[in-house]
């Protein structure tokens, strides 16, 4: 029965529909897996809620065979950044460690309304700030993959709990969030599929804010088709979110035709780093392999230039830190969250925030406050926004002559949990994912193979605005040639 855990969402749905097993049986198997997990992927478990949802799903399968939603009865995990009514939501920060929301985030509500079974809340870097899931108040998450030398490696971040849970067969799919690569990079490190839709495609209502102009909900699954099925369940216009876009939500799964003849694929020359950095040679070889797969299917390969790429990372860290310093100003222990009491209110603020925020969060608040301070606003934040526009314009100009862009997702494989990387090296994990985030473009990470250390490597496909269907179709070609690396 445990092989059931390794099925895709589409396969689970088909077998549930044929009544080869019940949603309750499927859910109980996942609950058992979650209870016995050694990855530290789940921070809050909701078995009673899951079984109740599974019973409802079984009733639907028994009495309604038509118009069944593809997520009915499917066990999923939700990143602990999304509010869940009456279920603890912490952003994996001590300052929110006992926060119980009174409402669901819009994407959570859509997911559950589509019949998904919530197994619990997933670990993450505190307030989504990190690339390794080592910045959580609940401790590190472990990647299910083990390096060839036996070393345990990180799952990536900030959606590390989501990627580890899906790759570790603890849930069939998971909600994540992506600010500068926080769905795509952990998906790459764990050998699964991670998709960030166009900014505004999914509502941000009830999603704890990190950087409001960049944050976007995303999905992590084991197959490209599953990403399509999950994505079409969480998209839609939300009148309560001013950044939500009122645009039709297609059935993304119908876009997967496996036909790309004549499709123009852009290869940005600025993303080729292996000539200067020999340690990136392995992903460069995999990139070439992916290019060949697409050529073999009839795609046209075109070299392009994205000249402002080198500015993307510093611009991103100025903007996201500035927005974080503003968003996190609300956490002071007055209305909710953990409070360190003092007779003096200013001292209480200082103690509460100083004790309950982690090191990385404090670092970004300080950087952001500096960038927004009087005398430096124009020199840093305003200039960063101007360069962001240039990065966006590079993409807009490129999409006049190409349809999609193919790049690596991350420069290297997952690194060891015990490896002490300096802050700059850690930030470089997002070098390939940040530009699409700055431009608000949809992007997907799909596995391309294994490194010499037996760890996953992945490629990223970037599409034009609202062309999630197109990037899913292109990713399905790479998936077809690569095969499923997750065993």
From Swiss-Prot:
Self-association and partners: Heterotrimer of A, B and C subunits.
Pfam family, one: Amidase
Primary role: Allows the formation of correctly charged Gln-tRNA(Gln) through the transamidation of misacylated Glu-tRNA(Gln) in organisms which lack glutaminyl-tRNA synthetase. The reaction takes place in the presence of glutamine and ATP through an activated gamma-phospho-Glu-tRNA(Gln).
Origin: domain of life: Bacteria
GO molecular function: ATP binding; glutaminyl-tRNA synthase (glutamine-hydrolyzing) activity
Organism expressing this protein natively: Ehrlichia canis (strain Jake)
GO cellular component terms, semicolon-separated: glutamyl-tRNA(Gln) amidotransferase complex
Reactions performed catalytically: L-glutamyl-tRNA(Gln) + L-glutamine + ATP + H2O = L-glutaminyl-tRNA(Gln) + L-glutamate + ADP + phosphate + H(+)
GO biological process, one term: translation
InterPro entries associated with the record: Amidase, Amidase_CS, Amidase_dom, AS_sf, GatA
Protein name: Glutamyl-tRNA(Gln) amidotransferase subunit A
NCBIfam families (alphabetical): gatA
Record: active site: 79 (charge relay system), 158 (charge relay system), 182 (acyl-ester intermediate)
Enzyme Commission (EC) number: 6.3.5.7
């Amino acid at each position: 029965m445990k092989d059931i855990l390794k099925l895709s969402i589409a396969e689970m749905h088909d077998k549930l529909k044929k009544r080869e097993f019940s949603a309750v049986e499927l859910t109980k198997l996942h609950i058992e897996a979650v209870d016995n997990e050694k990855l530290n992927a789940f921070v809050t478990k909701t078995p009673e809620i899951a079984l109740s949802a599974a019973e409802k799903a079984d009733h639907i399968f028994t009495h309604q065979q038509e118009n069944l939603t593809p997520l009915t009865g499917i066990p999923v995990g939700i990143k602990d950044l999304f509010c869940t009514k009456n279920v603890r939501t912490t952003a994996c920060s001590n300052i929110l460690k006992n926060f119980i929301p009174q409402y669901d985030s819009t994407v959570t509500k859509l997911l559950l309304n589509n019949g998904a079974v919530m197994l619990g809340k997933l670990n993450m870097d505190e307030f989504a700030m990190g690339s390794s899931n080592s910045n959580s108040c609940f401790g590190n998450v472990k990647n299910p993959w083990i390096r060839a030398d036996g070393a345990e490696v990180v799952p990536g971040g900030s959606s590390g709990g989501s990627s580890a849970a899906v790759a570790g067969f603890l849930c069939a799919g998971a909600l994540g969030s992506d600010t500068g690569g926080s769905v795509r990079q952990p998906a790459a490190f764990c050998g699964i599929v991670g998709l960030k839709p166009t900014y505004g495609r999914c509502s941000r209502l009830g999603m704890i804010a990190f950087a409001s102009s960049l944050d976007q909900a995303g999905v992590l699954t084991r197959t490209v088709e599953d990403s399509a099925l999950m994505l079409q369940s969480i998209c839609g216009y939300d009148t309560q979110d001013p950044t939500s876009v009122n645009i039709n939500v297609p059935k993304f799964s119908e876009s997967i035709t496996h036909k790309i003849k004549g499709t123009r694929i852009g290869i940005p020359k600025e993303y080729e780093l292996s000539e200067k950095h020999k340690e990136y040679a392995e992903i460069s070889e995999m990139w070439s392999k992916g290019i060949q797969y697409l050529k073999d299917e009839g795609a046209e390969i075109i070299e392009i230039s994205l000249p402002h790429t080198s500015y993307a990372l510093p611009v991103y860290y100025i903007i996201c830190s500035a927005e974080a310093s503003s968003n996190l100003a609300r956490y002071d222990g007055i209305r909710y969250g953990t409070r360190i009491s003092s007779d003096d209110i200013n001292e209480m603020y200082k103690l509460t925030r100083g004790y309950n925020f982690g090191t990385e969060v404090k670092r970004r608040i300080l950087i952001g406050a500096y960038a927004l301070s009087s005398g430096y606003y124009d020199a840093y934040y305003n200039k960063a926004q101007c360069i962001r526009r240039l990065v966006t314009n590079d993409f807009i100009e490129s999409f006049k002559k190409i349809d999609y862009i193919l790049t690596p997702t991350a420069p290297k494989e997952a690194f060891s949990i015990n490896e002490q990387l300096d802050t700059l090296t850690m930030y470089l994990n997002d070098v390939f994912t940040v530009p699409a985030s700055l431009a608000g473009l949809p992007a997907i990470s799909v596995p391309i193979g294994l490194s010499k250390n037996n760890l996953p490597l992945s490629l990223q496909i970037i599409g034009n605005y609202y062309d999630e269907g197109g990037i899913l179709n292109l990713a399905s070609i790479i998936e077809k040639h690569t095969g499923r690396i997750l065993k």
